[in-house]
Amino acid sequence: MGGSSRRQRSTSATRRDDKRRRRQCFSSVADDEEETTSIYGVSSIFIWILATSSLILVISSPSSNTSIQSSSYDRITTKHLLDNISPTFKMYTDSNNRNFDEVNHQHQQEQDFNGQSKYDYPQFNRPMGLRWRDDQRMMEYFMSNGPVETVPVMPILTEHPPASPFGRGPSTERPTTSSRYEYSSPSLEDIDLIDVLWRSDIAGEKGTRQVAPADQYECDLQTLTEKSTVAPLTAEENARYEDLSKGFYNGFFESFNNNQYQQKHQQQQREQIKTPTLEHPTQKAELEDDLFDEDLAQLFEDVSREEGQLNQLFDNKQQHPVINNVSLSEGIVYNQANLTEMQEMRDSCNQVSISTIPTTSTAQPETLFNVTDSQTVEQWLPTEVVPNDVFPTSNYAYIGMQNDSLQAVVSNGQIDYDHSYQSTGQTPLSPLIIGSSGRQQQTQTSPGSVTVTATATQSLFDPYHSQRHSFSDCTTDSSSTCSRLSSESPRYTSESSTGTHESRFYGKLAPSSGSRYQRSSSPRSSQSSIKIARVVPLASGQRKRGRQSKDEQLASDNELPVSAFQISEMSLSELQQVLKNESLSEYQRQLIRKIRRRGKNKVAARTCRQRRTDRHDKMSHYI
């Protein structure tokens, strides 16, 4: 009984304890439910906002007073966010936090090891989802991090200077040549620097050698100097040349720019010269190199003396003594050595009379060149040289011209006229004269009493025959006239080149072989390659007997440089070359065009007749 009663009491006590525990547990659970319900209500709101709108909560920057509250608030918010989201996102967040802590720990170790971080921005430990940018704090961090390294900036042409709150102000460390940097436009030196840099960039792109700025400076000066020798420089190039030359030759003209220094230096040198003794012999040697007024006076005095040192350089002072203050006519001494045909003629600048000139002149004209040595004079003296020895296939004939009038021949400036006439008092020749050597000579006398002689077999050679081709009329003063003859003509031969003078076809229908006008191989050939012939007009102005055309007579009457046959047969380029001659008058040019047109018409008519004859012959052949 006793055991059972004790067992019942323990059972009832156990039941009472269980009831008591149940009541305590129920009260605690109720309290917990109230607390969790309120918290679960707040967390559900955050979860709904994050899930529906995917917004990132941006909270303003916390102040220094509320730093503790913000940190506790961050912890509470993070706890509830991580407790009420999915397990996958919670695992992802935990892994990110662990990785972020590992990275911060590793970065802290590297910073402790290196002494300074390689990053210039601070590392903020903030959870995901809450971010803000504190510009003021970051700017303070950058400014307090230490001296900022200067970055070399190339000059750039800008309209206005950059205006930025983070920009640095003007400093003397900038790589520029401007002294005052508050100006928006660059200086001239900046522009020159930009030009040099541009040239270097272009040279680098092209793969050529990059020239240094100093070399470019001298190269520009050298280029302008070379250009000034060829063509005149422009105003801009002249200004640039002066600027470059001033900079290049600044050291050379430095002592001459300072007049006071120069005067003082000369005064010191003169004082040293006046002193009887010198301390150093080297100073005496240096002073002897400089010439002063006294030395120049001694030099001029030595020049004026006959037995001076400079006069000993002249070997022929006895033959040609020095004459001072003389005119040109008094100073020129004419003798056989320096006398030429051009000096022999009377000129407006020469007051020497022709009568004072020695008359010992040969039949052959002297040389026109200024060579008066004995070897050259003997070379041009009359010798038994025929043209075939020099030109084997030539048809040249020497034509000597003599002045038979009493008036003196005056030079008109033409070489082919000056050297051809000689002032000799020979009598006029008859129309047909037999020379002393038995050679036939035939002459033709013009109205101006100038005799033209053509020789059959030449014993003299005229070296100036190729220079006698002139497009200008041979005119002189009123005292004499000019009439010339060329032995070579495109259709007419010289009367002395054949023995059948009585033939009516002579000089008209029987031209000599090789005397026709030969067209030049190149249309750009010079005027000297064209053989110029001229028909000699008769004294009465009448046409010759035979089939001489009207155009040939017009060409000879108007002194055209070429014949009518040449005008009609020459190429267009050669015709333009003849028309460009400045010595031709407008009437002569019109006459040349007229003869050309009629010559072409004659050729066309001849071709037409030939075609008609050929067609008639073919028809008769078939019939």
Swiss-Prot record:
Q: Which Gene Ontology cellular component annotation is one that this UniProt entry carries?
A: mitochondrion
The gene coding this protein: skn-1
Q: Where in the cell is it found?
A: Nucleus; Cytoplasm
Asked whether the keyword Transcription is assigned, the reply is yes
Q: Name one GO biological process term.
A: digestive tract development
Sorted keywords for this record are:
Activator, Cytoplasm, Developmental protein, DNA-binding, Mitochondrion, Nucleus, Phosphoprotein, Stress response, Transcription, Transcription regulation, Translation regulation
| SUPFAM superfamilies recorded | A DNA-binding domain in eukaryotic transcription factors
Family (UniProt)? Belongs to the bZIP family. Skn1 subfamily.
Compositional bias per record (Polar residues), positions renumbered to this chain: 173-184
Q: In this chain, where does the modification Phosphoserine occur?
A: S164, S430
Q: Where expressed (tissues)?
A: Postembryonic intestinal cells.
Q: Any idea what a deletion of this gene does? A: RNAi-mediated knockdown of all isoforms results in a severe reduction in transcription of gst-4, gst-5, gst-7 and gcs-1 mRNAs during infection by P.aeruginosa or P.faecalis. Susceptibility to P.aeruginosa and P.faecalis is characterized by a decrease in survival rate.
Q: Where is this region: Basic motif?
A: 540-623
Question: Which protein are we looking at?
Answer: Protein skinhead-1
The segment annotated Disordered runs over 1-29, 158-184, 421-451, 467-557
Q: Which Pfam families match?
A: bZIP_Maf
Let me see what the UniProt entry remarks about domains. Alternative DNA-binding strategy due to lack of a leucine zipper dimerization segment: DNA binding domain binds to its cognate half-site, an N-terminal arm recognizes adjacent 5' AT-rich sequences in the minor groove and the intervening residues stabilize interactions of these two subdomains with DNA.
